[in-house]
Amino acid sequence: MLDLCTGNGSLAVLAALAWPEVQVDAADLSTDALAVARINVEKHGLQERIKLIESDGWQNLPGRYDLILCNPPYVCRQGMEALPAEYRAEPLISLDGGLQGSADGMDFVRHLLAHALEHLNEHGVLLLEIGNEREHFERAFPTLLAYWP
């Protein structure tokens, strides 16, 4: 399985703990985030099961996966302006989904979805966190069949 945009590695660690038979690739663009993820992976003794990969999106991920988890940057422009101070302490790249110019916060998600099938095995599943941006997501991808729990 893949945890894309792993950040501090928490989803990768949780997945490895939940499914002991699974190997996890955990990828992020940020070397700082991967350094924190490495600390968390080592803290839980999961170095043999979680592989940390520096990758800008799909760039360094040639494989296919049964499950891809992703907590991408998805906050829209208006949401970024209204973020509480404690959220602004996070790196901008981990939150701002409009770094390529869109107001809806779906820049990275557009790229992610455009190439997801190239990285999913048949019957594979992609799970995305979208936070409070469901309206923007549905407007950006009106024909995509999405499940909302």
Language-model features, listed with the residues they occupy:
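Conserved SAM/SAH cofactor-binding pocket of Class I
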Residues: M1-A82
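Glycine-rich, phosphate-binding/catalytic loops in enzymes
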Residues: A18, P84-Y87, L144
